[in-house]
Amino acid sequence: MNEARAIARCEEAAALLPPRFRRAALQMPDHRKRYTEEFRLRAGQPPAALLPEGEVTLPYFGADSRVTPRDLAQMVDAVTDYSRYACAETLRQGFLCLHGGFRLGVCGTAMLRNGAVASLRDISSLSLRIVTERIGLAEPTADSLFCACLLYTSPSPRDRSLS
């Protein structure tokens, strides 16, 4: 992925963050935006970005600027268009597929019904993964596979709902 596209994808992901964290993510220097893999919001912790060299705190807040449970709930409500029920199936599995190919990992308290996760409450952290295109990444592996190899995976829950 070229540099301009990587920066644009980071900015698209930042637009999904709660407003006070969105500004910080958008203020990151381009050399950091280019390599940002995900944004992490954990209750009681400062917001962070995951880069190849590790996790870095978004530096544009004071030391007392920490993610609150309200920030987390606000973000989940916003990305589900205020209809968590419509996304309940994937939310029970701990993630949400978002417009633009982004994926939001969700951690909270699982509510069980008959031994299975029925819902999540008390969300404690979110991880917004930035999808990137890596052209040619699998070529070395693909060359060593059998000539007639079929890779199969079941469709995601989102794909099943479209059929």
Predicted regions and their residues:
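N-terminal accessory targeting/assembly segments
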Residues: 1-100
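A short, sequence-level motif marking secondary-structure junctions
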Residues: 61-67, 109-111, 153
